[in-house]
Amino acid sequence: MSKSTKKLYKENWSFSDIPDLTNKIMIVTGSNRGLGFFVAREIVIKGAHVIMAVRNIDEGEKSKDIILTDNPNAKIDVIKLDLADLHSITTFTNEFKEKFSRLDVLLNNAGITAGIKLTPHTPTVDGFEYFFGVNHLGTFALTGQLFDILKQTPNSRIVTVSSLSHKQGSINFDDLMSEKKYSNMRIYAQSKLANLLFGYELSRHIAQQKLNIKSVLVHPGFAISSKKKQGFWINLGKNY
């Protein structure tokens, strides 16, 4: 492992480092599988009340049942959320606010990876390019609609999962929806760069307004999620 790669890892970190989260209300988007599922599983062990925000309710309920098998007293709600549909985002936030009066952590985990093979120019429900629409615009809209309840909750936190792939990206304002030139990797990198810029600007706004919120950006490291099973690295490995 190279020195630069080693910097991406904290080798002695474990789930035991997660602090007590008793009674914390936490939304984890895309938590029916992959990284989001494992985050949800571990934070309920620490006492958090987790809202699994998922596109597929049936899959979400199955994942909830798996968690409850080992943690029967876990507090978990499953609510439908499709980041490719602005109406779904509004419906989700309205339902959440009807049930809860606080939000301690919003974990923006859900997204589309570069390994997913989409038909070029696949649109979201609202007509946006799919990668940019889900990874950035959907996350932006969700965070904005929950910002009022986050402001009301002391020491709340917004965690947005980005990627080091942002270094390969640029924001092409002349072709934001990639109508002229299409490349999965380029569009994915653009969406992750947009996540990064959004997180930075959100942090600046929070500091300027002197709000008791933190905006945190994370690169999850190298992980084999269910989405990456369809991706380049897994397919490459199958050939050897």
Regions found by a protein language model. Give the residues of each.
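Rossmann-fold NAD(P)H-dependent dehydrogenase/reductase core
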Residues: 4-237
